[in-house]
A protein has these predicted regions:
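Charged low-complexity intrinsically disordered patches
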Residues: 1-66, 146
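Sequence-level detector for tyrosine residue identity
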Residues: 4, 9, 23, 28, ...
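Short, cationic/aromatic linear interface patches
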Residues: 79-146
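Amphipathic alpha-helical segments that form the core helices of the histone-fold
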Residues: 55-66, 73-88, 101
Length: 146
């Protein structure tokens, strides 16, 4: 019988896809940690370590997905498209996702689906979001200075 809690027991981190190519979990773990700057995020959000780890593992899980499609916001997208977008996520995208969560006022029934949607859309919506914030702040500043 194998003792799974014994520290000497190790399994391969290699996941084999349908086409025979290997996806090394360690390789993607390193790539994602570096691209989102996970340690810097944890420094800047000291009370959000668990949430940040959850976001990191959600990205990793999505990148390693072997299905043909991934369901995001009630739409099926090719896994390769989703993987490509998730591998381009960076510190600012995660920061944006945290802001979206903080500013959300509606009840989220499925947090995983909600986070997948935010992360998938982040590269496309981040600029518009911050531009709207700047415009709003500027308008408030001019109104208050009169």
């Amino acid at each position: 019988m194998i003792n799974y809690t014994d520290s000497s027991y190790t399994e391969s981190n290699l996941i084999i896809s349908d086409n025979g190519m290997g996806y090394d979990v360690d390789k993607y773990t390193k790539i994602i940690r570096e691209s989102i700057e996970l340690e810097l995020l944890k420094e800047n959000y000291p009370h959000e370590h668990e949430l940040l780890d959850g976001i990191f593992y959600l990205i990793l899980e999505t990148v390693l997905n072997k299905n043909d499609t991934i369901l995001i916001a009630s739409n099926k997208y090719p896994t390769e498209l989703v993987r490509d977008k998730f591998l381009k996520l960076n510190y600012m995208h995660i920061n944006y996702a945290l802001h979206c969560m903080d500013n959300n006022t509606t009840k989220v029934h499925n947090i995983k689906k909600y986070m997948l949607t935010i992360l998938f859309n982040a590269p496309s919506t981040i600029s518009g979001y911050y531009q709207a914030e700047v415009s709003h702040d500027y308008q408030q500043l001019t109104v208050n200075s009169k």
